[in-house]
Amino acid sequence: MGEQLNGLKRTHMCGELTVEDVDKSVVVMGWVQRRRDHGGLVFIDLRDRTGIVQVVFSNEVSSEAFEKVQSVRSEYVLAIEGKVVKRAPENVNPKISTGEIEIYANTLKILSKSETPPFPIEDRSNVSEAIRLKYRYLDLRRPSMQQNLMTRFKITKVVRDFLNRNGFIEIETPLLIKSTPEGARDYLVPSRIYPGKFYALPQSPQIFKQLLMISGFDKYYQIAKCLRDEDLRADRQPEFTQIDIEMSFVEVEDVLKINEKMIAEIFKETLGIDVPIPFKRLSYQESMERFGTDKPDLRFGMELKDLSDIVAQSEFNVFKTALKNNGSVRGINVKGAASMPRRQLDELVEFAKTYGAKGLLWIQVFEKEVKSPATKFLSEEEMKKILERLEAEAGDLLLIVADKDEIVFDTLAHLRLELGKRFNLIDENKYEFVWIVDFPLLEYDEGEKRYVAKHHPFTAPKDEDIELLEKEPLKVRAKAYDIVLNGTEIGGGSIRIHDTELQKRMFKVLGFSEEKAWERFGFLMEAFKYGAPPHGGIAYGLDRLAMIITGSDTIRDVIAFPKTQNAVCLMTDAPSEVSEEQLKELHIKVDL
């Protein structure tokens, strides 16, 4: 059985001891990273979340501690009392923060023993993610994982400090709410007290934060858990954390300005980086035209160019068909890549096809000639204008896609990113922020044969576009904004509708009958009757923001206990079956 502390108190963290502590008597506690036996001396590397300190056990200093340490192995939990000693110059270890000192142990308590762990507790450990997730409590002992979670904590601390300083109030909203599915599926919770009725777990605190604005809390925030029963996708979690913010009596500009200051403070405090503000801004339309996506990575160029007008009269069938079907012809210039081998060009063609393109036209620009499968279909004048539009020089490779706009944009956006990586055009140490604004308010869902909200049904249309809501819904722009960092959307929000009549019109355009709208959102519509201020806000994905700041490859590395890509917890084996008795209490029958 492990020993008890019996009043022994920790005086210092392992990684915080320095030469200033020499000759002090200290008590440290932690896990054994490594044990080395040098005959008359035993060396223990003791680890806690702050780092490692070397502890020396000598028979001459304490025969009792020296005898006891013989049984100690990796991951044993120890409490050690001893004296801090300066290391001899030749024994200094510059790789650790405590490398100039060591502790000579007087007392040793073995608080807990450990079996041999299934993998080494070190960052170099080459172990599968499945094993790491099964033994997550061991994985979290690794320095990189501890650093990730400490950085995540630092982000939330900066957010809280900044918002508190700026007059915001942290308010919690319910986790058991009414199901109002619009977008992803709700997680449902059966009510035992009301058989046949269900709560939903919140996909976001959206409606409640709007109700808080109507309640008079004009500056709200919350670090909120959100849950969405989404189809399985790479790097998505069924539960995730949002930095949720809402403000009253504001317009778009007010929301963007305070959020820029907050983001700048987060990056200053966590990475020591000065982020220039204000951030760049692109309209949704401009972002799509220039980068093929509303999540552009601005760390490199290779922008899309529209060639449709140049080839409008072309006899080339590929171009002709695309333009006839209201599509477009667009291209990018891969500087200095003209000599790309045919095999790699063919790979790019196949890559383009995975995004729905029927093909990919390439043009190699050399000093004295232009090589392309399309030379025989394009006139000399057309080719000349294409080269001019794409600012082609000798040595460049031009890639062109002709199809429906959505396919052209999607294909070229992915090609641009792929080639940016291949040719090392992306500076990994750069942070490029951009606000994407003026989103379309609505999209048309071919499957459901109705208009759906691009963001959510409470987003306000731009004032000048309100009159188009019923006549030309797809032309209506929203007072919505996303914040994109290095090609990843880290947050998004909007100014909300605060007028009952406008909200009714919005529901009608979305195909909700008045009855259906009241059934789902009646409590919000009722609240609007009693004086709602203009309000708006934003929500950030904390997991994704932490992933970028820590330089992690996946959001699972910045969440303490994540699910797998299949939404399973390998450590606790959730989700799991429950007993018949539990189901009976809830009046539920499982029909598989």
UniProtKB/Swiss-Prot annotation:
GO MF term list: aspartate-tRNA ligase activity; aspartate-tRNA(Asn) ligase activity; ATP binding; catalytic activity, acting on a protein; nucleic acid binding; transferase activity
Cellular compartment(s): Cytoplasm
Residues at which ATP binds: 228-230, 237, 489, 541-544
Catalyzed reactions: tRNA(Asx) + L-aspartate + ATP = L-aspartyl-tRNA(Asx) + AMP + diphosphate
Record keyword NADP present: no
Example GO biological process: aspartyl-tRNA aminoacylation
Alphabetical keyword list: Aminoacyl-tRNA synthetase, ATP-binding, Cytoplasm, Ligase, Nucleotide-binding, Protein biosynthesis
Annotated positions binding L-aspartate: 182, 228, 455, 496
Spans annotated as Aspartate: 206-209
EC number(s) given by UniProt: 6.1.1.23
Signal peptide: none
SUPFAM superfamilies named in the record: Class II aaRS and biotin synthetases, GAD domain-like, Nucleic acid-binding proteins
Residue(s) at site: Important for tRNA non-discrimination: 38
This protein's GO CC annotations: cytoplasm
InterPro entries per record: Aa-tRNA-synt_II, aa-tRNA-synth_II, aa-tRNA-synth_II/BPL/LPL, Asp-tRNA-ligase_1, Asp-tRNA-ligase_1_N, Asp/Asn-tRNA-synth_IIb, AspRS_core, GAD-like_sf
Subunit structure: Homodimer.
Similarity annotation: Belongs to the class-II aminoacyl-tRNA synthetase family. Type 1 subfamily.
Known function: Aspartyl-tRNA synthetase with relaxed tRNA specificity since it is able to aspartylate not only its cognate tRNA(Asp) but also tRNA(Asn). Reaction proceeds in two steps: L-aspartate is first activated by ATP to form Asp-AMP and then transferred to the acceptor end of tRNA(Asp/Asn).
UniProt protein name: Aspartate--tRNA(Asp/Asn) ligase
